[in-house]
């Protein structure tokens, strides 16, 4: 499916499976960028922030670290709601079916969002959304339960050659699944039992409990509070990262695995229903400007620092740059469709 294909908006919401909803209302503060809707009253109600994962994972924690300051810069109440399932497609469809009136946004993930329309026949595409800005980029990293008989990724690969192993991923599509598939595909004598654990929280829990032999997540999403509780096998890049002490694949001599030199991770970004910018340009501008202002506030950076070093990977990009990144990730993921067909 073309990443630029626009779909007819359905009249009824389609959900893949049961939806769990957890709400948290942000605090409304000073009205820095408000009253800028076309009717002069926006925002005059609470704004829903969709998180397409369960509560407690990296996307959820990042959202809840952001909304208190965003409430101040916009002058609005935010409510965070979790719609997990379908490797983020449940939440994606919720956003797609929402009215483009400035009262619904989502913190979504790349490349999960692209993979839903590329590989899961989601009813939406890239052009069905308006983009507000990026939030942060988290590297792709492998973990193992405490007490495992391997200390890094090279040792795990050797172990997996001789033993049946189960590898957990945060989704059936996206960066964690891609990393697992690329490692497995690189070596003819390697075969993983891949398990989609549907989110960072279940992946963390399964790793801590020893229910998997290894798992793929992001260092911040896994939660750096657990440094020392699990074994950090390595990051899928050549240079490593500072959030969690771990060797890079390149440092372990695993350069033959694709994308080690380039490195890749997971972006978090704020997305709105398509049509908002056209139908309510002032509201869209208010959301964009107030969101950008969040990254200038000391209180937000202090809160992000308290969240296990989130402040170290914050990376805001404006709407145009964000849309360009979305398109680039779509093209990037499309190259690996044959691999995802095997999951």
Please give the residue ranges for each predicted region.
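Ligand-binding pocket segment of bilobal, Venus flytrap-like solute-binding proteins
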Residues: 157, 168-247, 330
